[in-house]
Structure formats: structure tokens, C-alpha cells
């Protein structure tokens, strides 16, 4: 099965299924000499792991990561870093009654048609459980980017269903179960999600992820433009149906005189482009938005077919997220970190001695 590796110089390969024995990753290309422990990865994994609030799946996984290789005496060696997370709370019996049915809106049908065989337990490889390893690998990239380049990455939920953030308070993002940035909306979100769970339904969401301190020059035109690579990374996250950089789809209603980002000697006057011009980072904040669909794993009956093509009706039982956008925040952060780390190494490889007389703006 192809498509399990991401990146060129900083390469991440993941393996494992939702109800398998374990999940794993091999991280190639991490520079040597960086201090690294399992605790450095665990923080982001704890933010993503299931069962941390009543508004996410109640599957209980500790998601404790083990570093198997690539670290000696607390420092990276420059060799492959092996990572492993054991699965401990699989309930495969929840799926035994639907093993011959295709859950509508899921990857069941397409995986079956492509490979002729599929792991029906929790979606197998197509499950968002796989993203735990992306978060672990992304934590390595985030640590290097912050310590060596001053690049920091954070994300937050901007909209859940009809509820939109109307103000931004970064200090509360990590202090509520929604990763929401508007403190005035938390009670409304709580009530909305409680009602949604009673209905047995799900809802979509929009989140934003931002990278600060990114230097000018990252990105490889024309086919590996930085924004193209970011879109590729984000679209690879389960349930993501749309990605925008900067003002994104709002540019449709903007005039050129409004959208362009004027420059003065002391910096840019705006950032409609989201920190990327011509596929290359401009030195401003990189701003990325993601739209995630409502999960199809719901208690509302839906029409489908079985393996023989016979009509059927089904309800998806088991433990599922009523809004997958909530736990997608640390996943999106990780994917942005992987892109920036890869392009940082690629930029150094080709352009480490490039010097211009033009000042670097922010």
C-alpha cells in the first residue's frame, strides 16, 4: 500500500491500524544533537488522544509513545527515529455486526474496491487513530523549529457548526475542551454539543493553524510551492474537505488594491496572503484554515449496501467523535510543522549561502 511516507529530507513513514497491536512511525532526517525524550512528544499526544472530554470519543487510550531508536544519551543521533504507541482499548466486537456492510460516508467502500480486502474494525488504516503517529513525529519537528529557528506553531477551533468565534483570546485555547479562542462562546458550545450527542448526530468544524517566526525563503517553486505542500499535508488529514491560506476563499470578493500586502521599510502593512508569496514564505505569519466534515459514524440510521450489493440500513455503533474538528487541532499543527521542517532542510541544502542586500521584512 503506497502513500505512507510524507516529506523529502525530513521523512515520516507511519504504520498500524485502529484495532491492531500498535501504531508506529519512522522519522528520517532529524539533525543530530537535539535533546529529545519521550516527554517532549507526550504533551501533543495528550492533546490529541481520545477520551479526554465528554465531547470526544470515549475510547480510552493512553497513547504513551516509546522511542525505539535514533536517540542516544538523550540526544538525536541523526539516524532514523523509531516511534511506537501500543493500542490498549480496542473493542472490535462493536464492528462485528457491520463487517459486511459499508458505512456511508466512510472509506469502507473505496478501500474494499481498491484492495479487495479491508480491516473493518474501526476503519483499520483509514481511521484517524493513525494520526497519533503524525502528532508524535510533528512534535519532533516542532521542537527543532522552535529551538533552532524560533518558529512556533499553534492552532485553534474557529467555528463549530453554526457557532463562530467573534473574538480571539489565545490564552484560553488550551484551557477548554474545544480548543476554542472565544471565551464568550464556551457555554454555547457546551450546550450545543450536549444536544447533538442526544440526537446521535455529528457536526463539522473549521479550524485555523498559525506559524510565527518563519523566515523568508521556504518553498520550492514551481511544483513544491510552500502553500501547495501545506495544502497537500492538510488534505491528508481525515475528514478535511477544504484548505485555505491567508484570506483563502474570501479573495473572491476582494479587489487587488485591497488584497495585495503593501510593504514599507519597517515591514508589511497586511497579511492577506497568509505569509506566502509565489509559493515562498515571506517572513510573515503563515495562516492556514481547514474545514472538516461531520463524521458519518452516527446513531442516525442510513441507507447503504452490503458486499453483494444488496440494499441495507445501518447505524454505526461504537465510540466516535461527534465533532472530529476538536481533536484535529494538534494534528494540523503537526502537519504544518512537518512541512516547515522539511522545507527548512531543503532550503538550507540549496540556498544556505545566499545573501541579498534587501532587508528581510516582517
UniProtKB/Swiss-Prot annotation:
PANTHER family associated with the record: CHORISMATE SYNTHASE (PTHR21085:SF0)
Cofactor(s) named in the record: FMNH2
GO CC annotation terms, alphabetical: cytosol
Pathway(s) served: Metabolic intermediate biosynthesis; chorismate biosynthesis; chorismate from D-erythrose 4-phosphate and phosphoenolpyruvate: step 7/7
Entries under InterPro entries matching the protein: Chorismate_synth, Chorismate_synth_AroC_sf, Chorismate_synthase_CS
Entry binding sites for NADP(+): 48, 54
Class in the EC hierarchy, top level: lyase
Function as written in the Swiss-Prot or TrEMBL entry: This reaction introduces a second double bond into the aromatic ring system.
Keywords: Amino-acid biosynthesis, Aromatic amino acid biosynthesis, FAD, Flavoprotein, FMN, Lyase, NADP
Family according to the record: Belongs to the chorismate synthase family.
UniProt-recorded name of the protein: Chorismate synthase
One term of GO molecular function: chorismate synthase activity
The keyword Lyase appears for this protein: yes
Gene name of this polypeptide: aroC
Native species: Tolumonas auensis (strain DSM 9187 / NBRC 110442 / TA 4)
Matches recorded under NCBIfam families: aroC (TIGR00033), PRK05382.1 (NF003793)
SUPFAM superfamilies: Chorismate synthase, AroC
Top-level lineage group: Bacteria
EC nos: 4.2.3.5
PROSITE patterns: CHORISMATE_SYNTHASE_1, CHORISMATE_SYNTHASE_2, CHORISMATE_SYNTHASE_3
Residues that coordinate or bind FMN: 125-127, 238-239, 278, 293-297, 319
Cofactor remark from the record: Reduced FMN (FMNH(2)).
GO biological process: amino acid biosynthetic process; aromatic amino acid family biosynthetic process; chorismate biosynthetic process
Catalytic reaction annotation: 5-O-(1-carboxyvinyl)-3-phosphoshikimate = chorismate + phosphate
Assembly information from the UniProt record: Homotetramer.
Amino acid at each position: 500500500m503506497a502513500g505512507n511516507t510524507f516529506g523529502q529530507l525530513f521523512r515520516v513513514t507511519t504504520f498500524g491500524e485502529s484495532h491492531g497491536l500498535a501504531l508506529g512511525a519512522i522519522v528520517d532526517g532529524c539533525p543530530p544533537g537535539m535533546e529529545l525524550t519521550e516527554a517532549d512528544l507526550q504533551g501533543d499526544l495528550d492533546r490529541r488522544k481520545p477520551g479526554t472530554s465528554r465531547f470526544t470519543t470515549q475510547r480510552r487510550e493512553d497513547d504513551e509513545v516509546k522511542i525505539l531508536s535514533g536517540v542516544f544519551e538523550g540526544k538525536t543521533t541523526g539516524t532514523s527515529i523509531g516511534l511506537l504507541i501500543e493500542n490498549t482499548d480496542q473493542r472490535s466486537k462493536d464492528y462485528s455486526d457491520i463487517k459486511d456492510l459499508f458505512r456511508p460516508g466512510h472509506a469502507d467502500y473505496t478501500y474494499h474496491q481498491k484492495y479487495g480486502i479491508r480491516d473493518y474494525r474501526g476503519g483499520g488504516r483509514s481511521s484517524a487513530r493513525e494520526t497519533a503517529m503524525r502528532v508524535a513525529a510533528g512534535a519532533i519537528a516542532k521542537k527543532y523549529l522552535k529551538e533552532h529557528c524560533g518558529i512556533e506553531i499553534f492552532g485553534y477551533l474557529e467555528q463549530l457548526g453554526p457557532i463562530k468565534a467573534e473574538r480571539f483570546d489565545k490564552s484560553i485555547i488550551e484551557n477548554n475542551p474545544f480548543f476554542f479562542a472565544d471565551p464568550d462562546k464556551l457555554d454555547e458550545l457546551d450546550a450545543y454539543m450536549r444536544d447533538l450527542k442526544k440526537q446521535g448526530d455529528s457536526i463539522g468544524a473549521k479550524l485555523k493553524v498559525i506559524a510565527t517566526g518563519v523566515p523568508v525563503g521556504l518553498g520550492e517553486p514551481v511544483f513544491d510551492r510552500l502553500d501547495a505542500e501545506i495544502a497537500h499535508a492538510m488534505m491528508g488529514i481525515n475528514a478535511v474537505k477544504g484548505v485555505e491560506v491567508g484570506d483563502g476563499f474570501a479573495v473572491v470578493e476582494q479587489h487587488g488594491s485591497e488584497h495585495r500586502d503593501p510593504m514599507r521599510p519597517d515591514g508589511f502593512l497586511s497579511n492577506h496572503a497568509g505569509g506566502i508569496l509565489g509559493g515562498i514564505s515571506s517572513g510573515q505569519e503563515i495562516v492556514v484554515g481547514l474545514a472538516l466534515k461531520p463524521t458519518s459514524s452516527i446513531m442516525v440510521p442510513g441507507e447503504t449496501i452490503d458486499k453483494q450489493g444488496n440494499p441495507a440500513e445501518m447505524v454505526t455503533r461504537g465510540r466516535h467523535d461527534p465533532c472530529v474538528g476538536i481533536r484535529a487541532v494538534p494534528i494540523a499543527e503537526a502537519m504544518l510543522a512537518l512541512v516547515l521542517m522539511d522545507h527548512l532542510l531543503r532550503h538550507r541544502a540549496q540556498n544556505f549561502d545566499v545573501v541579498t542586500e534587501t532587508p528581510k521584512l516582517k
